[in-house]
A protein has these predicted regions:
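Metal-dependent phosphodiesterase/phospholipase catalytic core, i.e.
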Residues: 1-69
Length: 69
């Protein structure tokens, strides 16, 4: 299980919500099947719908990756 806080700590190069969304997609494609939203991202561009956006990105990336196998 990937925890959002661990992803953010492990990747200090992530400086925006958009960067974080790309990282979440990479994590899903690497084989993670769960993503825990344990911390709200504190980036200036974090939308109010941040949970839905990250969940959607994670699920779509995982689903598309499985279809391509």
């Amino acid at each position: 299980m990937a925890m959002l806080s661990n992803l953010m700590i492990s990747h200090p190069e992530v400086q925006s919500f958009e960067d974080l969304e790309r990282l979440v997609i990479e994590v899903a494609k690497s084989g993670e099947i769960f993503l825990e939203m344990d911390l709200k991202p504190d980036y200036p561009d974090t939308p109010r719908t941040w949970i839905a956006r990250l969940e959607s990105s994670f699920y779509r990336a995982e689903h598309i990756d499985r279809m391509n196998q």
